[in-house]
């Protein structure tokens, strides 16, 4: 079975990492990245790596994750157009944001999206197309709309709405594949957690233990 792990946030964030990493802290991003390579899955996608040079380790002289990824046989594609150019000739691939992106922690919110920004729909389509090159093996693909939760933390209803719609569009891509292969496709849509307490209003919540 071929395996793909994808998200709208960084490839080493908590939810994608839960499928391949074994670290004591979710913030050990460099080590999580090493686990990503060791897992040897076929396809990864997200905004980028959060700590590709191991900056958190004092005096570290660690090898860059991009170099290690290349040594492990992965092709790095920067954006969907670059993916389209490289996918056919690649055995294993990591899809990241275009090099022009200014924030490596996540792709832009759907409500703020500009022309050329990578979308969750593109990530989903890329994952399905890449993993289904050899259907005889079957595949598992995890797709996370990771910024729904972030927008809920900010109590930003408009942004939440657009992020959920973005996820809905990604599900439509998966459903298109299901319609072509109805007897062998299972789509599961779920939530690993939610912030809770989102209300109509303005601004994020605060924690006041003395109230």
Task: Give residue spans per PLM region.
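Short hydrophobic alpha-helical runs that function as membrane-insertion/retention elements
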Residues: 3-6
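A post-motif C-terminal structural segment
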Residues: 10-211
């Amino acid at each position: 079975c071929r395996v793909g792990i994808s998200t709208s946030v960084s490839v080493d964030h908590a939810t994608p990492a839960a499928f391949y990493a074994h670290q004591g802290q979710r913030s050990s991003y460099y080590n999580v990245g090493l686990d990503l390579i060791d897992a040897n899955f076929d396809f990864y996608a997200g905004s980028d790596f959060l700590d590709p040079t191991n900056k958190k380790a004092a005096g570290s002289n660690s090898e860059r994750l991009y170099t290690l990824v290349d040594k492990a046989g992965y092709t790095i594609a920067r954006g969907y157009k670059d993916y389209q150019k490289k996918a056919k000739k690649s055995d294993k691939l990591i899809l990241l944001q275009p090099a022009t992106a200014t924030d490596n922690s996540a792709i832009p919110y759907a409500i703020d999206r500009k022309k050329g920004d990578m979308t969750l729909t593109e990530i989903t389509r890329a994952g399905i197309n890449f993993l289904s090159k050899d259907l005889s093996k079957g595949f598992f693909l995890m797709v996370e709309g990771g910024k729904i939760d972030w927008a809920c933390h900010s109590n930003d209803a408009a942004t939440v709405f657009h992020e959920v719609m973005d996820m809905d569009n990604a599900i439509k891509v998966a459903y298109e594949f299901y319609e072509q292969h109805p007897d062998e496709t299972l789509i599961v849509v779920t939530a690993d957690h939610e912030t809770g307490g989102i209300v109509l209003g303005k601004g994020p919540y605060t924690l006041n233990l003395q109230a």
